[in-house]
């Protein structure tokens, strides 16, 4: 989730603690490709993929290499399609799901402000790093960083309760509206469906 970004940037003012939620609120849709780097116990795993999300709670994440997995949500259920296992898991949305990094892109602003607080935004040269903390002590998410270059979002990095550090480097970012059909999961024939 880094490099060449298509910008609908914050106007020519500097991102800071006071205007970050306004910036996020102005972004109703996101489409991007990404490279996800997960670090745990000094080991690194790299996965490529794409993401589409909107503020109505809907999203679709397609992992391409080395995983072949799709995770999507229609705002009511979370769907996890594992092509290798030929299995679709359907999980109802629960409150625990709200404290995950995808919430930054899918929740309405009033809900986002209830769940998270902006700890700081620090700018060095052309990079701004905003630190976001969950309000709940029971959150899976410990700390989240939004990284901007010249006011364009380039990376989402977080640390979780499993001692993992995950960095989503965004590229080919597009903030333009898209149809819900683009994030609807189509279920291949012969897939086992598991309800949780």
Feature annotation, model-predicted:
Residues 13-38, 44, 82-142:
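Flexible, processing/modification-adjacent segments and terminal tails
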Residues 32-34, 59-63, 78-81, 132, ...:
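Short hydrophobic/aromatic-rich beta-strand segments that constitute the beta-sheet cores
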Residues 50-100, 166-167:
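An acidic-aromatic
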Residues 2-11:
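Hydrophobic h-region of N-terminal signal peptides that target proteins for export
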Residues 16-19, 25-75:
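N-terminal mature ectodomain segment of secretory-pathway/periplasmic proteins
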Residues 49, 78-80, 88-89, 97-99, ...:
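Short, charged/polar low-complexity linear motifs in solvent-exposed/disordered segments
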């Amino acid at each position: 989730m880094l490099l060449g970004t298509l910008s609908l940037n914050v106007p020519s003012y500097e991102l800071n603690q006071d205007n970050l939620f306004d910036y996020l609120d102005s972004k109703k849709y996101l489409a991007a490709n990404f490279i996800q780097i997960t670090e745990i116990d000094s080991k690194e795993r790299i996965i490529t993929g794409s993401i589409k999300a909107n503020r109505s709670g809907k999203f679709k994440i397609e992992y391409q290499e080395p995983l072949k997995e799709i995770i999507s949500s229609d705002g009511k259920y979370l769907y996890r399609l594992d092509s290798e296992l030929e299995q679709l898991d359907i999980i109802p949305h629960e409150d625990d799901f709200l404290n995950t990094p995808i919430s930054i892109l899918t929740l309405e602003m009033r809900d986002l402000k209830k769940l998270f607080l902006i700890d700081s935004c620090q700018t060095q040269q052309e990079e701004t790093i905003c630190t976001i903390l969950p309000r709940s002590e029971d959150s899976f998410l410990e700390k989240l960083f939004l990284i901007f270059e010249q006011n364009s979002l380039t990376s989402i990095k977080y640390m979780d309760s499993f001692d993992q550090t995950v960095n989503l480097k965004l590229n080919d970012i597009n903030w333009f509206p898209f149809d819900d059909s683009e994030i609807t999961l189509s279920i291949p024939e012969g897939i086992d469906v598991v309800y949780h």
